[in-house]
Amino acid sequence: SGTMVSGIAKVDETTEWAVKLFDLNQEALTKSKKALETTLSKLVEKEKINDIEKSRIQNNISYVSNLQDLSNSDLVIEAIVENLEVKRKLFSELENYVSPETILASNTSSLSIASIAASCQKPERVIGIHFFNPAPLMQLVEVIPAIQTSEEVLTTTIKTISDWEKVVAVAKDTPGFIVNRVARPFYSESLRIYDESVADFATIDWALKTIGNFRMGPFELMDMIGHDVNYIVT
């Protein structure tokens, strides 16, 4: 129930889906619940939603710490650490609790969906659904079918994401997919400019935001994403 999970949950719950937010850590669940309350209260203050809508959204989400609580889910979206073996283990375990029709999706930003699917008894139900941070605000969502993914699962996933009023880009199951593949030079060339003492961090960020019209500079973005995650993606 970290940043991405909470963000994805906010997308789901505002579309009248019943949402279950899972984490083994009860403290993390409590933190997510408080963050949602803060976000919704701000939306009420700005008159984006009213108190009735706030209550409806809050009632749509439950916080669980046992995988068996996900048993009646139509769609499960995983957003844990970017480690292939950890994800494979989770997906394999999930199959013990969910129905055969449940779609299992990974929010991975770069790992092979086919490799994750290979850990499952029903690999055809596995697909990539890659949101961008912050998920409630970013419109683009990459949908990545593995070689094993069924056409029905792909079609259902595209419809679901579209119903959430997001823009779907279907990507090939290749490292980095679309956006993170394109972003590699954005980071690497910025690092090279710094390494060659052409400009410092702040100047590079300033130039790309002011002249290039990027919302965030490369170093600001790397700090936000986390260098550990960026390294794995690269």
Task: Give the residues covered by each predicted segment.
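N-terminal glycine-rich phosphate-binding loop for ADP-containing cofactors
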Residues: 1-234
